[in-house]
C-alpha cells in the first residue's frame, strides 16, 4: 500500500482507539484474518478485546505517542501510558507489581489493512520494577 496508510493505521489505533476509546474504528483498518499475538485471537474482534481490556484495566488511561515509523507494509509505534491499573501485568519474585508503561506496537499490513499485531514492552523498565525493593 503506502507509507502514509501504514502511518495512518498506527496513528488511528494509538490516538483514536486507545487514546479516545473509539473502538468502533477497529473494523476500518483490521483484516478479518488479523492475528493478535497478545490474545492468540483473529480478526477485528481480537483487537477489540485487546484494546477494551487494556482500557478497562486502566480507567482514564492517557496515551502518549512518542514516534511512529512506517514502511509500505508495516508500522511501528513507540508509546507510553499513564494511569492506575486495576490489575498488574504480573508480579516480581518479591511480590512487586509489574506495570511496563513503555510499549512498541508492531503492525504488519496487507492492502492497507492490519494483518498481524505484536506488542513489546521496555525490558529496562520491567527489570527496574522487578528488582525494586
Residue map of PLM features:
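C-terminal and inter-domain tail/linker signature
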Residues: 1-133
Amino acid at each position: 500500500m503506502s507509507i502514509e496508510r501504514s502511518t495512518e493505521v498506527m496513528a488511528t489505533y494509538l490516538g483514536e482507539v486507545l487514546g479516545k476509546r473509539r473502538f468502533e474504528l477497529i473494523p476500518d483498518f483490521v483484516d478479518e484474518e488479523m492475528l493478535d499475538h497478545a490474545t492468540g485471537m483473529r480478526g477485528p474482534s481480537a483487537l477489540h478485546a485487546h484494546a477494551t481490556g487494556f482500557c478497562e484495566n486502566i480507567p482514564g488511561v492517557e496515551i502518549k505517542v512518542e514516534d511512529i515509523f512506517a514502511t509500505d507494509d508495516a508500522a511501528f509505534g513507540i508509546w507510553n501510558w499513564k494511569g492506575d491499573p486495576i490489575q498488574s501485568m504480573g508480579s516480581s519474585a518479591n511480590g512487586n507489581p509489574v506495570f511496563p508503561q513503555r510499549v512498541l506496537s508492531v503492525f504488519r499490513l496487507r492492502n492497507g489493512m492490519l494483518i498481524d499485531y505484536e506488542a513489546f514492552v521496555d525490558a529496562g523498565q520491567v527489570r527496574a520494577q522487578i528488582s525494586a525493593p
